[in-house]
């Protein structure tokens, strides 16, 4: 049976982890947020979040976006490849409903799960 926890091992924790993702990364984006991915040598995917105050002004909005991103990742982690993902919010993300955000996350997770053509 699959577990759907979001443990510490599923998170990007240090600045070095984030910098590694930004080098040689694959991107999938929308007008509302971008997901950057890079292969890792682990047996599971990991998630990092970047939600700048400049993009989403209120703490409530930033926390909502992060909560929904983590929940979407947690629910899809068993279908995702072994990559490190960084989700970067854009200003218009705060205007979407929870359902719209989940649909968009699912679409981008699926796009990043496909094998590369390169």
Curated annotation (Swiss-Prot):
Sections of the chain in a coiled coil: none
Annotated GO biological process: tRNA 5'-leader removal
Top-rank taxon, per record: Bacteria
Presence of the UniProt keyword tRNA processing in the record: yes
PROSITE patterns xref list: RIBONUCLEASE_P
InterPro entries attached to this UniProt entry: Ribosomal_Su5_D2-typ_SF (IPR020568), Ribsml_uS5_D2-typ_fold_subgr (IPR014721), RNase_P (IPR000100), RNase_P_CS (IPR020539)
The UniProt record lists the keyword Hydrolase: yes
EC id: 3.1.26.5
One term of GO molecular function: 3'-tRNA processing endoribonuclease activity
Known catalytic reactions: Endonucleolytic cleavage of RNA, removing 5'-extranucleotides from tRNA precursor
Keywords annotated in UniProt: Endonuclease, Hydrolase, Nuclease, RNA-binding, tRNA processing
GO cellular component, one term: ribonuclease P complex
Enzyme class name: hydrolase
Role this protein plays: RNaseP catalyzes the removal of the 5'-leader sequence from pre-tRNA to produce the mature 5'-terminus. It can also cleave other RNA substrates such as 4.5S RNA. The protein component plays an auxiliary but essential role in vivo by binding to the 5'-leader sequence and broadening the substrate specificity of the ribozyme.
Stated family: Belongs to the RnpA family.
UniProt subunit comment: Consists of a catalytic RNA component (M1 or rnpB) and a protein subunit.
Protein name, as recorded: Ribonuclease P protein component
Organism this protein belongs to: Vibrio campbellii (strain ATCC BAA-1116)
Gene field: rnpA
């Amino acid at each position: 049976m699959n577990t759907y926890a979001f443990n510490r091992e599923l998170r990007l924790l240090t600045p070095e982890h984030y910098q590694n993702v930004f080098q040689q990364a694959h991107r999938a984006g929308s007008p509302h947020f971008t997901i950057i991915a890079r292969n890792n040598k682990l047996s599971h995917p990991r998630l990092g979040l970047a939600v700048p105050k400049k993009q989403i002004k209120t703490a409530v909005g930033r926390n909502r976006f992060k909560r929904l991103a983590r929940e979407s990742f947690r629910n899809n982690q068993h279908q995702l490849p072994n990559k490190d993902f960084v989700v970067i919010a854009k200003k218009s993300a705060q205007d979407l409903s929870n359902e719209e955000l989940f649909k968009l996350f699912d679409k981008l997770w699926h796009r990043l799960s496909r094998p590369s053509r390169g």
